[in-house]
Amino acid sequence: MQINKESRELLEKVMTRLHNSIKNPWETQMEPYQVVPNVFYVGNKYVGSYLLKTDAGIILIDATLQETAYLLIESIRKLGFDPQKIKKLLISHGHIDHCGAARLIQEYTGCEIYFPQGDAFFLTDRRDLLLGDVPDFKVTGNYDYNSQMDFGNIRIKPVHTPGHTPGCTSFLISVDIGIEKLLLGMHGGMGLNGLSLAELEQNHLPASLQKDYEKSLKEISK
């Protein structure tokens, strides 16, 4: 996988804007909205987060940054939900913009947190790969890629899609709407940042992640 100059410049702009969201989080605010019945977008302009209203309670996918957590909580309230009733937080991968607010949310709600096993070493001996200061949080469990998580009216099938990170996880979400069933897909991390050979070598990660990324795109499309 070759990353040309134009792509690299675009990636640098994306990362600059993301880092600016830590300094000025209010600039990332956007209105929450319903994706389909019982599935809502509650993230911001740069980092996604999804709220699922299930028979088993509120499920949240990705925590966003600690600095933007107040925007996340405000978005949940705007939709008429109580953020303290979040039961489970599913984290797609171990970067600060997806798990930075995990500790805050866990302390605020008492929720369980699920985290990809392939990124578990980010939380221990390779905290530099988190790409920032992420407060410690308690991991309840890892994903079983051979089964789905059943929440009654909504079922989530985690799919291992390595590349962006070794443990990057995507979610296939099956939603019951009356007698109909909808299938939604959320890719856990399509960013090319970190995937150049120079960056992989610098981060002491295997070059095979490039091929893993290509394979993961095919896997999620099945």
What is each of the regions a protein language model found here?
Residues Y41, I59-D62, K88-I91, P158-H160:
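Short catalytic-loop micro-motif centered on adjacent basic/acidic residues
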Residues V14, H19-N20, Q29, Q34-V36, I58, L65-E67, Q148-F151, R155-K222, ...:
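Metallo-beta-lactamase
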